[in-house]
């Protein structure tokens, strides 16, 4: 009962209204987290600017491999989806240093997969460079790592790894 009183005072309500107040606070927290994710994704997109000039061609397949620091895994996936739409057909590899850790996401379009691209195998090949591991499906994969210093090498390796995959 004493704990109930303390909890009620903490959230500025009476014990009878505690559950309702907590439900309200939880909903508010969820909405703020969602808004935060959205803003992170938007900030990452703006920080990257127009990256389409960094698109390379590997055996006739477009490859966009870029770094977007400060973006968490969800943000990278969202950003990847947006870039995939812009790219049209090809492979996208995104890397981010976030809270001292590395996040990697790879995505391949249908045409790229028909040519032999496999996001899961691609991410496995480059994740070791950042001291991590990962995997996924042919069209989307992700990995984490502990060595941000390896990001540039991992992105460079994406090109050779993709070259090996393509027919």
Identify what each model region corresponds to:
Residues 1-167:
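Terminal appendage regions of diverse proteins
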């Amino acid at each position: 009962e004493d704990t109930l009183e303390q909890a009620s005072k903490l959230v500025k309500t009476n014990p009878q209204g505690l559950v309702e107040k907590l439900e309200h606070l939880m909903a508010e927290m969820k909405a703020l987290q969602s808004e935060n994710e959205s803003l992170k994704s938007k900030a990452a997109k703006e920080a990257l600017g127009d990256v389409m000039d960094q698109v390379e061609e590997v055996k006739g397949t477009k490859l966009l491999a870029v770094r977007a620091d400060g973006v968490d895994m969800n943000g990278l996936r969202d950003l990847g989806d947006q870039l995939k739409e812009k790219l049209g057909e090809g492979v996208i590899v995104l890397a981010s240093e976030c809270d001292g850790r590395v996040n990697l996401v790879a995505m391949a379009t249908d045409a790229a997969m028909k040519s032999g691209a496999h996001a899961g195998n691609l991410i496995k090949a480059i994740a070791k460079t950042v001291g991590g591991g990962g995997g996924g499906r042919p069209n989307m994969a992700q990995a984490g790592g502990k060595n941000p210093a390896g990001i540039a090498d991992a992105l460079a390796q994406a090109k050779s790894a993709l070259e090996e995959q393509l027919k």
